[in-house]
Amino acid sequence: MTGRRTLVVTNDFPPRQGGIETFVRAMTDRFPADSVVVYTSAEPGAAAHDAALPYPVVRDPARTLLPVPRVTARAAGLARRHGCDSVWFGAAAPLGLMAGRLRRESGVRRAVATTHGHEVWWARTPGARALLRRIGERTDAVTYLGAATRAPIAAALGPAAARRMVRLAPGVDPEAFAVRPGAREAVRERACDGAQPGTRNRVRERYGLGARPVILCAARLVPRKGQDTLIRALPAVLRSVPDAVLLLTGDGPYARTLRRLAADTGVADAVVLAGGRPHPEMPEHYAAADVFAMPCRTRRGGLEVEGLGIVFLEAAAAGLPVLVGDSGGAPDTVRDGETGHLVDGRDTAAVAERLVALLRDRAAAAAMGEK
């Protein structure tokens, strides 16, 4: 077998949903199909998903890959079988720990590990910090999303590995999310006059949104993402924009808490929890929205941060103004006051104020989305 080939080792791969999964899949798609092999964990619905891809995907029976001897041996075997001379760890921690053995047993000559937000936790936790340093020693390059995550990770890696760090930030295909000028207004007009809705109104039809102003948050349902802050802000939003609705897409352990919070806050009728949606459906969700908001916040004394937030980039590509929480690398996705607003994700009043301004002045909001 000739030519260079890369083994991608990752837990974060569709049909599992999330920003890292989107990032890893998009990066892998950019390899020539005959130059990449993916080794990833089991996931419901994976067989149909993988069959449609132009490159091989090998699923481990485990739901989570860990750098244990069995997994490392299988990765080494795949690298030998497919003639891989490089390995890319889609998330550095913890899988990058297998880089040394992969080199010894498979002929892999180059190893690259990508960091996101959770490696900041590793960098600031003593035991995990030592393991992160080991990953830096065993790989040729560790990538980072932006300055906010680089600083703590570089300090943990040590001087030599820090000098080899390379920025690798996600991007999106603007054409995949572009909304035709005037399409949102046309959708709202059709909903008002009862005419048959067009293609971009299917999301509004599905959730019974009609012509209501829609605040969209697309994220895993966990406290860091700030869906609870959006729900707490809704009473103030509804006093100024009575027909507004909050559309939450995503799965996660916080779903039951959010439903209860919406009921206790008296805004259950204005909150739609849509569950996880396949990524190919997301352009229509963005097209159905008027504002995108994810007031993410740093938690656990700085251990838990937002790495970047690819959803902010997708929303911007769809022409939406974005409301961004000031956690980790998320501020890199917005020009405050130009393409949206940067807020303290813990400040419910500030979140409500910015949402009201965006929903009431649609011309200004649309101008932000166009920048």
Residue ranges and their predicted role:
Residues 143, 185, 189-190, 209-225, ...:
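Conserved donor-binding/catalytic core segment of Leloir-type glycosyltransferases
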Residues 243, 270, 350, 357, ...:
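A short, well-ordered alpha-helix in the C-terminal region of glycosyltransferases
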Residues 148, 171:
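Carbohydrate-associated surface elements
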Residues 276, 287-305, 320:
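Acidic donor-binding loop of glycosyltransferase active sites
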Residues 326, 333-337, 341-349, 356-363:
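Conserved acidic donor-binding segment of nucleotide-sugar-dependent glycosyltransferases
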Residues 293, 312, 317, 321-324, ...:
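Short hydrophobic beta-strand element within catalytic cores of glycosyltransferases
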